[in-house]
């Protein structure tokens, strides 16, 4: 009696894994129109003075170049490695600023490699910049389909 149950379990698992692999393949095969596109977003942080901006180039249906920045509309400056100066004396915010700066630098590289925003994972401690990046990319790609 155990053999049919084990066989059924393995058969079910095989079907499930096949379906999962198929759906993941479908997500990564989306092709976009060649051109240059921009997207701007504040993601879910609508009460903060920050917004993200993505400029991407699509060549042969795939993203070939991508630039990402976060701007502070109150201070009129770009979020960068020096932004932590605004949090002098607050070690937690300084570390958060550093983590998010790592995200700003790495998300475009990871996205260019994966070609699927859903396959880009947030850098540890950099969810804020990840959410802004993801929303900005999605906004840019709306016009590229």
Language model features: what each stretch is:
Residues 1-9:
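Bacterial N-terminal signal peptides that target proteins for export
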